[in-house]
Amino acid sequence: MLGRDVPGRPVLGRELKRRNLLLGAAATAATGGALAGVAAFSTSRAPATALQKDLLSRDPKASKAARSVYRLLAGLEADARAGRRRGTLVGQHAEVHNERYNPEYGDHTGPKPPGYYYRKPQDITGKLPAFLELDLGPGYQQESWGVGEARDYSRAAWPARREFWTYTNDVVDLAMGVWHGLPRKDDGSYNPTGTETLWNGTKTVLPANGGAPAGLVGMSFHQPWPGSPVKSYEQTLRRSAPSAKDPGWIDRVLTPGSAEHAALLLDLSFLADHLGYLAAYDVPVLLRPYHEMNSIGGEQSFWWAGLKPQQYTALWELLYHYLVGSRGLHNLIFVWAPTAWDGIHGREPWDFYPGGEYVDVVGVDDYSGTPDNPFDPAAWTSTWHRGLEDYGKPRILAESFHVPLGAAQRTTLDKAPWVLWTVWGDGLTAKNADADVQQTYDDPKTITGGRESGPAGVQWLALHDGTFE
């Protein structure tokens, strides 16, 4: 989820993201106990399955690079399940639209370059994250989708030279930079140097990472409701969508031939055009759409969190078949990530699982507690890690305000050996002491990014040619 994107207004914490839900031990007490809160939302679960080892079982045309990335994740998962944990990739989400346009966002007032929170771990620790997640949504209060400078992949469909859409160009340039390096030699791609002068005379400077492959790339999609006249965070919420008053709206969205369905496909085409550019340069993307579908935040949940399970899985399948089938995108690794099912933020998510044929990685967005006051005092985040085991997929902590290791939690990843742990945006500085960030990045089993990826690290270049084992 995202922070508010109102120009000139602060985005604080995950006030940053979730403003309506209680956090921590006080909320647990209000429900009469953590486990009781979970049990109140019991749903059905599929039987345990063996660990998926290769993308070909889901997509026979998966790119070699995407298969290599998946083998890395599956290998880390297999080792963890066997009791010989090799390491955890440390990730960072960057809210590029807020970095670029909201002067109150982040750890100081004033403008920030795109990718500010990609570089911030390096400013603190000397090391880059191994994974950068980005987002083409939700827009910054603009009418219709758009882009900054016109490019081959966007000029035919999307209005160009829109100042408050320039961040979408930054998003793909950052993704290219993490996978291929920044700055890099001219390879026919856009902005290989990381420095670009725009039509309005302003200059964009992206963070350098050594000029060589430096990590993995992900994409979430905070999609405003299909057909929304304004693209903004507010329009991603259930209270703003037609479904708040019209229970039949979502069925029309899912029905080919309807105006609502056409609006959905328009949104997905915006996503696909940008992902297609990355596919053309062989950039694998961990795509995490329609997350936190099990939220119990009511009207302040995302519009897709108000759906019945069968509607949600139909929406997921529609997106999948459009991106992979209609658009031929075989660089994608699909991530399904409910919110923590603590009975406060979310209910048990099992009925919302689209199925192994549509999902490669499972994860959780965990805002259920803090390192000082965890949901499960015995082992922070372990409840969610155990709950996802039977899907037979690599398990990731997809969103957290907090780094996994620090003064309050020194053994998190031994007890819950996630293969990837991603910190959300400015939560890195708002919710973590520098010493805790340093401890996480310095841990011998933390996999970081850049040319040097730590003792448990990865040779990023080996992922590119499909030879990684």
Regions found by a protein language model. Name each.
Residues A34-A50:
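C-terminal region of N-terminal signal peptides and the immediate post-cleavage residues
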Residues S144-W145, A150-L318, G325, L329:
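Substrate-binding cleft of extracellular glycoside hydrolase catalytic domains
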Residues A46-E133, G137, V147-R155:
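N-terminal module-boundary/linker segments of secreted carbohydrate-active enzymes
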Residues P349-D372, W424:
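Aromatic- and acid-rich polysaccharide-binding/catalytic face
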Residues M1-L16, A25-A34:
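N-terminal secretory signal peptides
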Residues P394-E469:
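Substrate-binding cleft of secreted/luminal carbohydrate-active enzymes
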